[in-house]
């Protein structure tokens, strides 16, 4: 295997520990890497049983659009079907080049949200929406895949986990959050939507009915310590 290192996609990403997964080099909204062991010359000796899937839109706090979700599902499904992968690390690249902010995922990109869901668009504004394609809410399919795949999915939260991003951390098997930068917020009340998928049901099961309602109804920010408690 080659000694060439992948691009450094995040300040907390060590290229020497990873390689890009073959066949997924065309991703634009996420990155997909396989953990590797290298020898003293930097040559890859073997693949390790961990993959890293990361949102790669730090300039918008790693918000997802339909294209992002398409790529996320492809990567997760590939990891599910790869027999020598045991663990999936789900995280967000960063920080933002604009302001240095960190995010795991801030949920759906509100700029391309319509009445029927989030729309495919050629750009980042409502004017670039493709009117020939229906809106999508298929992040719920990703939630279902995470809950049913026979792999351990760990959410690594190094910044904001908000809205749909908060729900992704909830459906993951484990969450490891930065004590300094990890922030959690369910923004449904702010943007006028509701996660009727696994996110709300599992949150109530994990933290109790009353606290889950507080998280959803009040849209309050919680730090990593409070969410741990």
Task: Specify the residue positions occupied by each region the protein language model found.
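Conserved CoA-thioester-binding segment of acyl-CoA-metabolizing enzymes
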Residues: 2-95
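Short, charged helix-to-loop "capping" segments that act as catalytic/coupling loops
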Residues: 47-48, 83, 89-107, 173-189
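Hydrophobic/aromatic residues within transmembrane alpha-helices
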Residues: 53, 90, 109, 168-169, ...
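Glycine- (often His-adjacent) and acidic-residue-rich active-site loop
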Residues: 60, 92-141, 192
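Glycine-rich acyl-CoA binding loop
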Residues: 61, 65, 135, 158, ...
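Short, flexible helix/strand-to-coil boundary loops that buttress conserved ligand/catalytic motifs
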Residues: 64-65, 108, 117, 188, ...
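Charged catalytic carboxylate motif
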Residues: 67-71, 138, 145
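Crotonase-fold acyl-CoA enzyme core
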Residues: 144-229
